[in-house]
Amino acid sequence: MAEIILNVEIRDRAGTGGSRETRRQGKVPGVLYGGPLAPVNIAVKGNEFRKALHTGKLLGHLVTLQHGDEKQSVIAKAVQFHPVTDEPLHFDLYRVDEHQLIKIEIPVHFKNHDISVGLKKGGTLEIIRHTVELACPADKIPEELVIDLASHDIGDTIRISEIKLPEGVRPAMERDFVIANLKASAASQSTEGDTTAEA
């Protein structure tokens, strides 16, 4: 079951005018789409939506949508923010079954920078992908993919095959793509050159 429950109401007016009217009422307008049903214009109370956002478990996660006695599992696909105030302006929700296989972008997190063999030698981490698209059941979406840099040395290439994924979760692409490289910096190359010359 999803951790977040959003209480929604149906919006009568669509389009820009309808969205503005919804925001004037202190609510955030959105659209529910996906599956065999037609898109539905919805709204959530502003304080409730902001509270859900601040948990960090709204966007890209399984959410329970509640309208009266009806409940629906959805994925929060996108949120638009005001460029100045950073207030949420609009959101998109996608209908899913809890066990439905979906494709979704998951953030990559690198840990143990301070004890990384390669970084301690002066190497640099070149990140190729900050997110990875995974295929997984809607109720098993990982929070993030964690890569441990502790044992990685200069010259190492970190590929998706090195990451232990949860059961039932796999990369959306079949090829063994690169996520990051540990490269020699100019300073580390210079140090190695000086050492070689002295020897």
UniProtKB/Swiss-Prot annotation:
GO biological process: translation
Region forming the signal peptide: none
Entry keyword annotation includes ATP-binding: no
Pfam families, alphabetized: Ribosomal_L25p, Ribosomal_TL5_C
Gene Ontology molecular function terms on file: 5S rRNA binding; structural constituent of ribosome
Keyword RNA-binding: yes
Entry keywords, A to Z: Ribonucleoprotein, Ribosomal protein, RNA-binding, rRNA-binding
InterPro entries for this protein: Rbsml_bL25/Gln-tRNA_synth_N (IPR020056), Ribosomal_bL25/Gln-tRNA_synth (IPR011035), Ribosomal_bL25_b-dom (IPR020057), Ribosomal_bL25_C (IPR037121), Ribosomal_bL25_long (IPR001021), Ribosomal_L25_dom (IPR029751), Ribosomal_uL5_bac-type (IPR020930)
CDD domains associated with the record: Ribosomal_L25_TL5_CTC
Disulfide bonds: none
One cellular component (GO) term of this entry: cytosolic large ribosomal subunit
Superkingdom of source: Bacteria
Subunit structure: Part of the 50S ribosomal subunit; part of the 5S rRNA/L5/L18/L25 subcomplex. Contacts the 5S rRNA. Binds to the 5S rRNA independently of L5 and L18.
Family (UniProt): Belongs to the bacterial ribosomal protein bL25 family. CTC subfamily.
Function: This is one of the proteins that binds to the 5S RNA in the ribosome where it forms part of the central protuberance.
Protein name: Large ribosomal subunit protein bL25
